[in-house]
């Protein structure tokens, strides 16, 4: 569904495949205390599985890294009996559900994130020229991927990206 509490808002199909995109923050090779998303097993802790929202439970099995040690891929197994909406959906307990995209269907997108324009709450309150108080990092542009249903988005269409906030096309 487009919104689980408002079924009248319709639904869309997402394809599931062997290669998926997840957010980098949804996996930790060395998780901090209290981390509740996808992890590998360690000598003293089992792997932490997660539910892929509206899909299956997955568990990380290994990672690939580039020459700088940055993780470039997470390998995982999925448990076919845990598909959302089936009798076995809750057969493996998880502490989190994460969103994902099929690599095959994901569309590249430019995302613009905006922060405060000024570095102080009241730029006109002092004797400093307001132009000196402009936040040089008030706009961040990054490349990302979005689900295929956004390909027909029109200017000013609004979307909520789960756990991230609201965005305007």
Report the location of each language-model feature.
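Polyanion-binding catalytic cores of nucleic-acid enzymes and NTP/SAM-utilizing transferases
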Residues: 1-168
């Amino acid at each position: 569904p487009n919104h689980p509490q408002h079924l009248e808002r319709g639904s869309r199909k997402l394809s599931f495949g062997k290669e998926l995109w997840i957010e980098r923050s949804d996996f930790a090779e060395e998780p901090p205390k209290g981390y509740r998303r996808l992890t590998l097993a360690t000598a003293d802790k089992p792997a932490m599985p997660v539910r892929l929202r509206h899909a299956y439970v997955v568990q990380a099995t290994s990672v690939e890294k580039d020459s700088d040690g940055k993780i470039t891929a997470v390998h995982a197994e999925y448990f076919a009996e845990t598909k959302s909406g089936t009798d076995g959906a809750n057969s493996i307990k998880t502490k989190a559900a994460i969103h994902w995209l099929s690599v095959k269907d994901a569309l590249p997108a430019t995302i613009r994130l905006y922060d405060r324009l000024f570095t102080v709450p009241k730029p006109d309150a002092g004797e400093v020229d307001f132009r000196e108080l402009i936040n040089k990092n008030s706009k961040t542009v990054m490349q990302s991927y979005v689900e295929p249903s956004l390909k027909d988005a029109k200017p000013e269409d609004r979307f909520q990206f789960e756990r991230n906030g609201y965005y305007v096309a």
